[in-house]
Swiss-Prot record:
The gene is lpxH. Substrate binds at N79, R80, D122, S160, N164, K167, H195. The lineage of its organism: Bacteria, Pseudomonadati, Pseudomonadota, Gammaproteobacteria, Enterobacterales. GO terms for biological process: lipid A biosynthetic process. This is UDP-2,3-diacylglucosamine hydrolase. One of its GO terms (cellular component) is cytoplasm. Pathway: Glycolipid biosynthesis; lipid IV(A) biosynthesis; lipid IV(A) from (3R)-3-hydroxytetradecanoyl-[acyl-carrier-protein] and UDP-N-acetyl-alpha-D-glucosamine: step 4/6. It holds the Pfam family Metallophos. Transmembrane segments: none annotated.
Length: 240
């Protein structure tokens, strides 16, 4: 019995080794799981479910194969793929979750999320996030021709990269008070998230009790997953 969590794969055709590693993960490790949760940024970018990118179709087929084998797959949107919609969910068999979800995992209440909402010290990013998560803005963007959406997405990624290069690492990490506030709001002692690309297990205090924040790593030179069993919560790095 095990439930698996991954995040921040940033899949793109320019990184075939990561794509191949994910396909192997779906075919091997994930097949033995009770469920798979993908906590955002599965893709490097997502400009709409109507994008004919062959990689998207390939990943939908692979995830659907996992689901059809009896392993449910759940997805929380990240900051790169927040426009993944019902069409891709239907094609892949994934179940879309809200940005915060509490799970009962073998007797543990665990809060899961992508993690970008915890980075409240980065006021510039939070303002940008509020704009692009506006439903009206999203509907307008999705009405644009694909070639225009691609240009806008490329410009936004370039702008984000430039902005991040001038920010301190502390600003781009989670805010400790926000973490505690979220855990106390949901009355949990466990939090699993991604986004920051800083894999670690942090011990803290919430609800006047010991608590734990487990951060998934990004898939670059190796894969990263959290494996939750009735007896343990493990952060695991593995070769791609």
């Amino acid at each position: 019995m095990a439930t698996l969590f991954i995040a921040d794969l940033h899949l793109q055709t320019e990184e075939p080794a990561i794509v191949a590693g994910f396909l192997r993960f779906l075919a091997v490790e994930a097949r033995q799981a009770d469920a798979l949760y993908i906590l955002g940024d599965l893709f490097e970018a997502w400009i709409g479910d109507d994008d004919p990118n062959p990689l998207h179709r390939e990943m939908a087929v692979a995830i659907k194969s996992l689901v059809d084998s009896g392993v449910p797959c759940f997805f929380i949107h990240g900051n790169r793929d927040f426009l993944i919609g019902k069409r891709f969910a239907r094609e892949s068999g994934m179940i879309l979750l809200p940005q915060e979800k509490v799970l009962d995992l073998y007797g543990r209440n665990v809060l899961i999320m992508h993690g970008d909402t915890l980075c409240t010290d980065d006021a510039g990013y939070q303002a940008f996030r509020a704009k692009v998560h506006n439903p009206w803005v999203q509907r307008l963007f999705l009405t644009l021709p694909l070639f225009i959406r691609r240009r806008i997405a490329a410009r936004m990624r370039a702008g984000s990269k430039a902005a991040n290069s001038s920010k301190s690492l502390d600003i781009m990490d989670v805010n400790a008070q926000t973490v505690v506030a979220e855990m106390e709001k949901h009355r949990v002692q466990w939090l699993i998230h991604g986004h920051t690309h800083r894999p670690a297990v942090h011990e803290l205090s919430a609800n006047d009790q010991p608590a734990f924040r487990v951060v998934l790593g990004a898939w670059h030179h190796e894969g990263s997953m959290v494996k939750v069993t009735p007896d343990n919560v493990e952060l695991i790095a593995f070769p791609l």
